[in-house]
């Protein structure tokens, strides 16, 4: 059995017209991920429709239609192998759920690839590009690469490419605290397949790696085993002859049988008897492990989804109130003091009230634009004071980042995303 490659979750971000899906499609196609039979069939259809010469776009459209027809080739589609990693492509922003999933941990991206159109150097950066970068920065994604796409539309000009690199570096990346010197920029033409997987012969001036080689320069996610134990509860079962079995995913720290544990905000404690995953007993559970465990001294009625488990010497923080930095993504009107939407943090969903709007920030630079604003609207970034309407666990993002981020939902949509930068504990 060959050792499995580590999994790397990569978010592809950028303006919708920059050629994001073409870039993803090209990576999947040229790395041999899409079933050759499907490609053959689409090639045949292309030539029957007089589109011979195997047009890549036709394959991409064909895949899109397959999805619309409900054929399940979606999964294979979103994964490909590089030399070093099994790369999972995390759905890009634009999907409303992307933000919620990123924050609730369903699909934490380890790195991001920003896809830009080289022609933006002439027309200016798209606002969506700024928003996406600001968002992944807020969500704690620090590894970034940039694919400068559509090089075929500027005759593979080094000058145009450099102009785009300069504009991104000076007008965006530096402002958001990324150091452009540490970021790989790659000139690509995804439509024709230059520099995605196959090295291009059209840009002799570019000596650097292809996009897939750049993905291999990202660091694998580190397991935060050195942080205090935190495990949000996803569900609680009662199993005959065993007792209460909570299930969830360890976010930080390590949990072992025999450990004394505390659940907050429930305020109950117990002792771990056994830990299981896929019907096998485990000697310990580490970050990323989805496990069920049997706990002595805790009844099914005592704990619920949204409670967080920790060790007695460092219990999860129950917030009386907290200060947060948020970015408002979409809202039909405005947010004012007294607004009480639902906060989604780890597995908890709790209505929380905006007590103070302290500062409005420039979303591109983080600088203070206005003290004590009267309201916030879509596109604003701000520092606010929040009070949960019932007990909830949230941590300072500087101490335990995995439990410091949240999405704010209202009217069936994600209206804002943010992180807790200071918390006043009720239980410490």
From Swiss-Prot:
Chain intervals for the UniProt region annotation (G1): 14-21
Binding-site list for Mg(2+): 21
Compartments (UniProt record): Cytoplasm
Positions with a binding annotation for GTP: 14-21, 91-95, 149-152
UniProt-listed PROSITE patterns: G_TR_1 (PS00301), G_TR_2 (PS51722)
A GO term for molecular function: GTP binding
UniProt KW keywords: Cytoplasm, Elongation factor, GTP-binding, Hydrolase, Magnesium, Metal-binding, Nucleotide-binding, Protein biosynthesis
SUPFAM superfamilies linked: EF-Tu/eEF-1alpha/eIF2-gamma C-terminal domain (SSF50465), P-loop containing nucleoside triphosphate hydrolases (SSF52540), Translation proteins (SSF50447)
InterPro entries, alphabetized: EFTu-like_2, EFTU-type, G_TR_CS, GTP-eEF1A_C, P-loop_NTPase, Small_GTP-bd, T_Tr_GTP-bd_dom, TRAFAC_GTPase_members
Coiled coil regions, renumbered to chain: none
An annotated GO cellular component: cytoplasm
Residue intervals of the tr-type G domain: 5-225
Region (G3): 91-94
Pfam families: GTP-eEF1A_C (PF22594), GTP_EFTU (PF00009), GTP_EFTU_D2 (PF03144), GTP_EFTU_D4 (PF14578)
EC number: 3.6.5.3
Stretches for region G5: 189-191
Family: Belongs to the TRAFAC class translation factor GTPase superfamily. Classic translation factor GTPase family. EF-Tu/EF-1A subfamily.
Function summary: GTP hydrolase that promotes the GTP-dependent binding of aminoacyl-tRNA to the A-site of ribosomes during protein biosynthesis.
Stated name of the protein: Elongation factor 1-alpha
């Amino acid at each position: 059995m060959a050792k499995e490659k580590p999994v790397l979750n990569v978010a592809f971000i950028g303006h919708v017209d920059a050629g994001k899906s073409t870039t993803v499609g090209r990576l999947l196609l040229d790395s041999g991920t899409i079933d050759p039979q499907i490609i053959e069939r689409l090639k045949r259809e292309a030539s029957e429709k007089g589109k011979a010469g195997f047009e890549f776009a036709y394959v991409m459209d064909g895949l899109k239609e397959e999805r619309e027809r409900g054929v399940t080739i979606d999964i294979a589609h979103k994964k490909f192998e590089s030399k070093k990693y099994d790369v999972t492509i995390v759905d890009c922003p634009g999907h409303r759920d992307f933000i919620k999933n990123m924050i609730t941990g369903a699909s934490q991206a380890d790195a991001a690839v920003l896809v830009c159109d080289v022609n933006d150097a002439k027309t200016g950066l798209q606002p969506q590009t700024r928003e996406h970068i600001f968002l992944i920065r807020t969500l704690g994604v620090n590894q970034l690469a940039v694919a400068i796409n559509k090089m075929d539309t500027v005759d593979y000009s080094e000058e145009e490419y450099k102009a785009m690199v300069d504009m991104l570096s000076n007008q965006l990346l530096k402002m958001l605290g990324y150091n452009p010197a540490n970021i790989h920029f790659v000139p690509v033409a995804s439509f024709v397949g230059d520099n995605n997987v196959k090295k291009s012969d059209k840009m002799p001036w570019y000596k650097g790696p292809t996009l897939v080689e750049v993905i291999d320069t990202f660091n694998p996610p580190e397991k935060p085993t050195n942080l205090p134990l935190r495990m949000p509860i996803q569900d609680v079962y009662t199993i005959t002859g065993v007792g209460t079995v909570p299930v969830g995913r360890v976010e930080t720290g390590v949990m072992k049988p025999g450990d004394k544990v505390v659940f907050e905000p429930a305020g109950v404690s117990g002792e771990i008897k056994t830990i299981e995953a896929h019907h096998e007993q485990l000697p310990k559970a580490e970050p990323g492990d989805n496990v069920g465990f049997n706990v002595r001294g805790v009844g099914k009625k005592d704990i619920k989804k949204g409670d967080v488990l920790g060790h007695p010497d460092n219990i999860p923080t129950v917030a009386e109130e907290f200060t947060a930095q948020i970015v408002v993504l979409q809202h039909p009107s405005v947010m004012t003091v007294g607004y009480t939407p639902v906060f989604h943090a780890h597995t908890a969903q709790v209505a929380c009230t905006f007590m103070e709007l302290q500062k409005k920030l420039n979303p591109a630079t983080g600088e203070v634009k206005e003290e004590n604003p009267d309201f916030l609207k879509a596109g604003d970034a701000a520092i606010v004071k929040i009070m949960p309407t019932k007990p909830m666990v949230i941590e300072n993002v500087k101490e335990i980042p995995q439990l410091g981020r949240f999405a704010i939902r209202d009217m069936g949509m994600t209206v804002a995303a943010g992180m807790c930068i200071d918390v006043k504990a009720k239980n410490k």
